[in-house]
Amino acid sequence: MEGPTHPKPSKDKTFSWDLMILVGVLLRLDVGMANPSPHQIYNVTWTITNLVTGTKANATSMLGTLTDAFPTMYFDLCDIIGNTWNPSDQEPFPGYGCDQPMRRWQQRNTPFYVCPGHANRKQCGGPQDGFCAVWGCETTGETYWRPTSSWDYITVKKGVTQGIYQCSGGGWCGPCYDKAVHSSITGASEGGRCNPLILQFTQKGRQTSWDGPKSWGLRLYRSGYDPIALFSVSRQVMTITLPQAMGPNLVLPDQKPPSRQSQIESRVTPHHSQGNGGTPGITLVNASIAPLSTPVTPASPKRIGTGNRLINLVQGTYLALNVTNPNKTKDCWLCLVSRPPYYEGIAVLGNYSNQTNPPPSCLSDPQHKLTISEVSGQGSCIGTVPKTHQALCKKTQKGHKGTHYLAAPSGTYWACNTGLTPCISMAVLNWTSDFCVLIELWPRVTYHQPEYVYTHFDKTVRLRREPISLTVALMLGGLTVGGIAAGVGTGTKALLETAQFGQLQMAMHTDIQALEESISALEKSLTSLSEVVLQNRRGLDILFLQEGGLCAALKEECCFYADHTGLVRDNMAKLRERLKQRQQLFDSQQGWFEGWFNKSPWFTTLISSIMGPLLILLLILLFGPCILNRLVQFVKDRISVVQALILTQQYQQIKQYDPDQP
């Protein structure tokens, strides 16, 4: 750009050469980055640094990709100036600076311009010139000629601070006063910051590489010498802490996804015709798998099918998401992941209860060793947490003395290295090296924008963008400890949120119950197989009786089958009993008002339909007589006035005179 013709000589723009070394060092600081996927989410931190003092003027962190994590940054002009603009012997009253409220106020009304140092233009000079040795180097700022640029990375403009800026007369400068020093001044701000600036990234800045810090120079536009301030903008990219496994099974985190069988397509019978396409990693919940073994006898109770259980999980997730964030559910796809893990835990902060006796939740929920292979976030931890899992802890408590129980809030669990449990015993925790993290348990459901599925059916040849998979657990994390699951709050919204979350909890409970039945069926199959093997073994021993039995005939060591299914059967019986107790506890926690809506599905529709007319009728009955009386009284008053006017028109006023006057 070509700058205007200014009557200011370029020789006035001088600065200390010592800053060139500092800027040269900062420009060579590189952040080592690999070549990751462009859709990977990072924790991005942007920092504005005063190059003279090395202090940070602003540090903003956000989650996003390397192409969209560009926030708007706010800072004060004095944060990048420090004490470099304080008056000197040559200019005792400069009209700018940050050491006094009056100078800060005068500085606020002075224009400024910014010149980039990353352009490496020789005519613009170096740090001693603020990269503005000649006119035309400025790319942004707040002056009357409004400098702009199509290639620079940032724009810097003045911000707005509310307050009183009348510094004449009584000397009230409002926010230019530091409230820590002048607490009695009306409108005093933190540190006397009354020169706010707004930094935004341009389109060119969003496309450039931020491998190292980039510097700029800011100068005031005034008569005489233009003071210089140097600052840099840098980006720090950190990977988000990966989820870690919690539980005794250390094999789950390293397990591979299940292999795809070629015959599986012939065993899928679609219930509804919804297209022939499919997406890897997504479970088709509208399909049923043909049984591979003997079907269940008619005498056995009818259980909900696999397809219905999966649909209930997705439907419960949708209802919970629709209540908490309805804008996200206007047009989206919720996909149930078909590969393990099927559930994930989100570490949360919560107020767990400390009880001397075991609460009902400790008795009704299953206490088997269930491993959660993915736990992410940061929450409350208790016990001696190893260094490998300290990233999951935002608040750590070593333990409690005594023999009492810590019950997790409703809808949450303790994920311990010995398994998942709703409550923990401090006696066991103090005796062992166990540690636990408070988590929320969510089904593994991913959230996608509508374009995600459309791209799979698009037959045109184009490069498809890799979608950003966002699990619903990250979107609903903190829902239970926020009070919805516990029913905290009053009104229709609180009851609705509690009901929707309860439906999701019931769907997960049904899925876990189906898992128990699958394990029981596997145990029965194993027992039946062992009986067949033992029967064949006895038959072969009879055939080789003369040789001394089968083992002697084979000249091998004799092997005997040890059946451990009895222990499995006992554990499954206990699990069924606890599931039954949990169902009873779940039913007992529902209030009488919630029971109305659960007993009859049409009751909710009936209430919502007749509630409006009933309220209108009630208002008419309450306020109708009063309004009618007021209306009748008003009509009577108007009629009385009209009657009085008619009567006065029939008579004439008699003239009065004084008889004493002639």
Curated annotation (Swiss-Prot):
The keyword Transmembrane helix applies. The chain crosses the membrane at residues 607-627. Residues 251-281 are annotated as: Disordered. Residues 534-550 are annotated as: Immunosuppression. Residues 35-606 are extracellular. The keyword Coiled coil applies. A motif (CXXC) lies at residues 332-335. Residues 258-274 have a biased composition (Polar residues). Disulfide bonds join C115-C132, C124-C137, C332-C335, C332-C559, C551-C558. Residues 468-488 are annotated as: Fusion peptide. A motif (CX6CC) lies at residues 551-559. The record marks R465, E466, L645, I646 as: Cleavage. One of its GO terms (biological process) is fusion of virus membrane with host plasma membrane. Residues 628-662 are cytoplasmic. Gene3D superfamilies: 1.10.287.210, ENV polyprotein, receptor-binding domain. GO terms for cellular component: host cell plasma membrane; membrane; viral envelope; virion membrane. This is Envelope glycoprotein. It comes from Feline leukemia virus (strain B/lambda-B1). The lineage of its organism: Viruses, Riboviria, Pararnavirae, Artverviricota, Revtraviricetes.
